């Protein structure tokens, strides 16, 4: 059965950590399964106010007791991996083992690579991502202490834009795939079949889809989604987010 999460951008009126923590607490109480945040340091117009997702996640961890939490997605190429290792372990401890780390290449179109002196070339960012994931695993395994609550590692979801295949191959080495730009459930079903063929039988692997508020999650769950997250876009009214959270998730019978 698919699990259901809330997925918000900490922008504008949602850039305030106390507001995000309050929304996360309401999500926890309303029966949702996860609360995830976009990870950006800047964004294209008309967005101006961008909250730090990692400080926000610390507040979220303290405000909740049940839901999974995490960034979706962190471009590792613009981060110092040893710092991410400390942040993720600390969040995993703070949340008692509820962190999932979403990673990907990120997108230069939002103005958060070259303007800040970061690598923009996609091939170089891909190399840095792969190396960063290997380094994270090494740090989590005990090279740096403390170690995460979750063992053998904090779950890693890898994002990639449909129909590119390289992110899919990368994701299959980790714990889940967050494909963006899917044309429909049939495309997700293809990815689910690919995952079943490539992974050992019975080994957990998440397929995550993001849907706008109100879209029927049933076809996506039937196609193989293990997580359906409600994505409000870059600047929703806080009232809309609260309304969806308070209504609770749509539970599916497959």
Where are the language model's segments positioned?
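Active-site-adjacent structural elements that line small-molecule/cofactor binding pockets in enzymes
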Residues: 1-254
């Amino acid at each position: 059965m698919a699990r259901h999460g809330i997925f918000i951008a900490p922008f504008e009126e949602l850039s305030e950590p106390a507001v995000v923590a309050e929304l996360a607490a309401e999500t926890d109480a309303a029966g949702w399964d996860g609360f995830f945040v976009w990870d950006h340091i800047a964004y294209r117009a008309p967005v101006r106010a961008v909250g730090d997702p990692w400080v926000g996640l610390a507040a979220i961890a303290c405000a909740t007791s049940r839901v999974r939490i995490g960034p979706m997605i962190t471009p590792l190429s613009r981060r110092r991996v040893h710092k991410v290792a400390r942040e993720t372990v600390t969040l995993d401890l703070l949340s008692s083992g509820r962190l999932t780390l979403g990673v990907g290449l990120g997108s230069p179109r939002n103005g958060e690579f070259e303007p800040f002196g970061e690598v923009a070339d996609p091939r170089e960012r891909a190399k840095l991502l792969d190396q960063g994931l290997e380094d994270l695993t090494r740090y989590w395994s005990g090279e740096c202490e403390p170690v995460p609550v979750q063992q053998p590692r904090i779950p890693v979801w890898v994002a990639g834009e449909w129909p590119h295949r390289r992110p899919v191959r990368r994701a299959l080495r980790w714990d889940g795939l967050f494909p963006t730009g899917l044309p429909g459930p049939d495309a997700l079903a293809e990815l689910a079949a690919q995952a079943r063929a490539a992974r050992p039988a019975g080994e957990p692997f998440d397929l995550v889809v993001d849907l706008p508020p109100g879209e029927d999650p049933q076809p996506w769950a039937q196609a193989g989604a293990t997580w359906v997250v409600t994505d409000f876009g870059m600047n929703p009214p806080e009232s809309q987010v609260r309304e969806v959270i308070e209504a609770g998730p749509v539970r599916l019978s497959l």
